C-alpha cells in the first residue's frame, strides 16, 4: 500500500465471490456490502458501538456498518455484564450493538434478516487510513483487560499480512468455521478481517461443544478451515466425533503440543498451523506444530531481542510493541518461544518455567485439561487443578515425578470436573486462584478429608 494513499477499500474481494455463510445460506460480497451500507445509515448517532452480537455474521455486518458510518467498535474481553459495564463507563458515548440488553445503555439490533432483500451493491466503500475503527481489549489473563486502539491502516495492512502468512498457495475458497468469539483479537483477525481480503467464506455460527463443532464443519463444503484453540480442539479430538476432512486447522491463544497437533492431523486429515501473536500486535508468526519447533515470522514484522525484553516492529503498527514473552532468535525470520515473561517461578532456589511445567502436565495420557500455578507470591509450593476423570491426585503426582524436579511438583493437586476457561480457551489467573481457594477452604472444613483427592 503506497504511503501517500489516504484510504483503502473495505474489501478487495470480487463482488460475486461468497464472503459468508449466513442463517439463510451463502452471502456474496455485493449482497454483504449493500446490507452493511444500509445498516450504517440506521445506526444510532454515537461514537462507539459495543458489538456483542452472538451470531458471527451479525457481528461481521455490524462491524463493517460501524466502519462505514465512521464509528469505532468496542470489543470487550468477554460478554459478562460487569466487563461490558466497565467498558461502557470508560467510553460513555456508546451503545450496544447486537442481542444483549443492559440497563442504562441504548441497544440497537443488527436484524440482518430484514436487510436480506436489499439490492446488491456495485460500490465498494473506501475508509480513511487514519480512522479509528476498533478498540480491542486484552483477555485479562495476566491482569485487568487493557484497551488497544486499531486504526484502519493497522487493520487492513495486518489483514494483508495475515493473508500472505496463512493462505499460502491457497487458490480455492476456504469455508471457515471459528470456535473463538469475534470480539477476541484472534477471532477478529481470522473470521472478520481475513475474509475481506482473502478467499474465505465464514460461517455465522460459533459452536462450543465438540458434537456441535463437528456438525457445523460437516455442513460446510470442502475445503474447510477451523479457527480454534488448543482447549477446543483437544476436547473435539477426545470426544471421538465423526471424522470430517479439515483442510486447515488454525490454532492460537495458548501453546499446542506437537503430540496434539500430530493427532489432529491424522484424525482429520488436516494441516495444523499454530499462530503466534498478541492483542497489541496481532498475528505475527506461524509454525506447522506437528513437525516444526521454530516460529516463522511474517514478512511485515521484525523482532529486536535484548536487555531483557523483546520489541515487535511493523510499518502498520503505530508504535513498537513490547512482547510479554521470552523469545530467542534462531535464523532469518525465525525464533524459538521460551515462555511468558511472567511465567518464571523460583522454588527452593531453583528457577522454572510454568509453561514448561504445564506442557509436561498436559502430556500425561490421562489428563484432559489442567493448570500448574503459583497460588500467591509468597507460596513456597506450586499447585495444580487437573481434569482427569477416574484418576486420583496421587496418580497424577506419580505420573509427573519422572519428568519434573521434586521442587516443582505441584502440591496440592485438586481433581476438578472442568476448568473455568473463557470462550477463547484462556484461563485468567484471577479465576484460577479463586477456584483453588474455594476448593481449599471446602477441604479444610471437612472433618474427614479424603486422601484420594489431595496430595501433600
Residue ranges and their predicted role:
Residues 324-408:
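AMP-binding/adenylate-forming catalytic core of the ANL superfamily
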Residues 2-5, 10-15, 115, 119-137, ...:
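Conserved pre-ATP/AMP-binding loop-to-beta segment of ANL
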Residues 26-28, 125, 133-160:
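Conserved AMP-binding A3 loop
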Residues 157-175, 183-225:
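Conserved AMP-binding/adenylation subdomain of ANL enzymes
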Residues 13-44, 150-153:
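Conserved AMP-binding/adenylate-forming core of the ANL superfamily
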Residues 345, 385, 399-456:
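Conserved C-terminal "lid"/linker of ANL adenylate-forming enzymes
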Residues 237-292, 302:
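Gly/Ser/Thr-rich phosphate-binding loop
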